[in-house]
Design a protein with these regions (language model features):
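Charged, glycine-rich active-site and insertion segments that engage polyanionic ligands
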Residues: 1-49, 70-73, 106, 142-145, ...
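Conserved alpha-helical scaffold flanking the Walker A/P-loop in AAA+ ATPase domains
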Residues: 15-19, 95-116, 124, 128, ...
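Post-Walker A helix-loop "phosphate-sensing" segment adjacent to the P-loop in P-loop NTPases
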Residues: 48-63
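AAA+/P-loop NTPase substrate/partner-engagement loops
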Residues: 61-93
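Flexible beta-alpha connector loops of hexameric P-loop NTPases
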Residues: 88-95, 122, 166
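Loop/turn-to-beta-strand initiation segments
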Residues: 111-116, 141-147
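Conserved Walker B
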Residues: 121-125, 153
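Conserved catalytic/switch belt of AAA+ P-loop NTPases
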Residues: 131-145
Length: 336
């Protein structure tokens, strides 16, 4: 995965490319940001740029060729100088895993220019494993770089965070995700509908099929319509049950189902705002349901529309804080 193939994050990718080219890459870095937005791919791009046999140098930047023997082996996960550490079956990264890569990192690269240790989901490091990293992060081997990839940097020990500069990766734009999906064979309509509910995560967009996301959108649309005409709390709470219906992958949790419905609802409410404000309908994320959107626009306009959009955002944030799933669904329908 050369730098040029990473979707979005242009400023950070340019910074990494310049750092590799100028030999100014810090010996340890935290790549932080939401799940599924390309942090791990960016880390692999660094590893390729450091070890590519035929790198392309353009002024003050560098990029891997992506096709040489070294790049191919890194992409396949079999390069001896690129070590990937991931959580085990129990969901954590144990101290033995960390000790092994620390020992290997002390030696000169076997065949490349620099060893790269990529710790994916670094927030899964148990406390003992994090503590075992401290000395290495404080006095890193000159021929190695440690890249800690995490969606929850706040769970890392302060002593770990203080030793590693942090790069903050932001959610991808819906346009970036739609382009990536179309490159994978999605129609433009499908790609835009999926991207609108992906919450800035290409990984999330790729995990769910277009059909699953359309089902989720139908549920969200139906709940908005039902709640808009319900005058008493009892009827609204009945609608909350629909938000907990199973939509998506078979192994998904109730929290996952509610989350996908709320992201679909957020996408619909954004489109409603487009119609209410008289903006160009060509920017709608869900143009195939424009008649239904226009009916919702008759209700969710002005202050009520703004309150509904804010309530959905707050509900999604509450889910991320592990609030009770049923409690979040019930609270939301009473706010819409």
């Amino acid at each position: 995965m050369p730098f040029r193939d990473v979707i979005g994050h242009n400023r950070l990718i340019d910074l990494l490319a310049r750092s590799v080219a100028g030999s100014s890459l810090p010996p340890s870095l935290i790549l932080a940001g939401p799940s599924g937005i390309g942090k791990r791919l960016a880390a692999l791009s660094v590893a390729q740029a450091l070890n590519c046999l035929n790198p392309a140098v353009d002024g003050s930047t560098i990029d891997a060729c992506g096709v040489c023997a070294a790049c191919s082996r890194i992409a396949r996960g079999v390069h001896p100088d690129v070590m990937l550490v991931e959580p085990g079956d129990n969901g954590s990264i144990k101290i033995d895993q960390v000790r092994e890569v620390i020992d290997r990192a002390q030696y000169r690269p076997f065949e490349g220019r620099r060893r790269a240790v990529i710790i994916d989901q670094a927030d899964a490091l148990v406390a003992a494993a994090q503590n075992s990293l401290l000395k290495t992060l404080e006095e890193p081997p000159p021929s190695s770089v440690f890249l800690l990839v995490t969606s929850r940097p706040d769970t890392l020990l302060p002593t770990v965070r203080s030793r590693c500069p942090q790069l903050r990766f932001r959610p991808l734009t819906a346009e970036d995700i739609a382009r990536a999906l179309m490159a994978r064979g999605y129609s433009e309509t499908q790609a835009r509908a999926v991207a609108a509910t992906a919450d800035g995560s290409l990984g999330r967009a790729l995990e769910a099929s277009a059909g699953e996301l359309v089902d989720a959108r139908d549920v969200a649309q139906r709940v908005l319509a039902e709640v808009s005409s319900a005058r008493d709390a009892g009827r609204r709470l009945e609608s909350a049950k629909e938000l907990l219906t199973k939509t998506g992958a078979s192994g998904a949790t109730d929290r996952d189902h509610l989350s996908i419905h709320l992201r679909a609802m957020s996408s619909l409410l954004r489109d409603v705002e487009v119609l209410v404000t008289g903006a160009d309908a060509r920017v709608l994320a869900n143009p195939d349901v424009q008649p239904e959107l226009e009916r919702l626009a008759g209700v969710y306009q002005g202050e009520r529309g703004r309150q509904a959009f804010t309530a959905v955002d707050e509900a999604l944030a509450a889910l991320q804080r592990n609030a009770g799933v049923k409690l979040v669904a019930d609270w939301l329908v009473l706010q819409l």
